[in-house]
């Protein structure tokens, strides 16, 4: 059984994230989506809300588990005996940054590899930052996020 972890802040989870999760769920026995509390970011949704939104978005995927965490990713990887770390990469800038993290995580986890998955073309431009920006400027994000996220955003706008 191969267990992978897909960490991120997911603020909010987008259809680009869902693309990576769904494809990972086909490739691996178990996928843990790890929603991070990042003190250096000011989130639109708090950690508990983000965990719930991811859970609602992946409910149809039997081999996907969602957790929240505020620890070093390497500690979570070791504690849960994770086989690999999944990272989505859209651009060469993403790849350079993620390569650095992959080297550090390999060192801190005694060899756990990071696997890079590019999103399918239709989601290559989507990011949580872009979704938040469009939403905060009253734009339509309905085609960019799962239904649960759209409902939460609409509720937040009222």
Swiss-Prot record:
GO terms for cellular component: cytoplasm. Its cofactor is Mg(2+). It comes from the Bacteria. Its EC number is 2.7.7.3. The keyword Cytoplasm applies. It catalyses: (R)-4'-phosphopantetheine + ATP + H(+) = 3'-dephospho-CoA + diphosphate. One of its GO terms (molecular function) is ATP binding. ATP binds at residues 9-10, 17, 88-90, 98, 123-129. It holds the Pfam family CTP_transf_like. It is found in: Cytoplasm. GO terms for biological process: coenzyme A biosynthetic process. Substrate binds at residues 9, 41, 73, 87. The keyword Cytoplasm applies. Reversibly transfers an adenylyl group from ATP to 4'-phosphopantetheine, yielding dephospho-CoA (dPCoA) and pyrophosphate. Belongs to the bacterial CoaD family. This is Phosphopantetheine adenylyltransferase. It comes from Histophilus somni (strain 2336) (Haemophilus somnus).
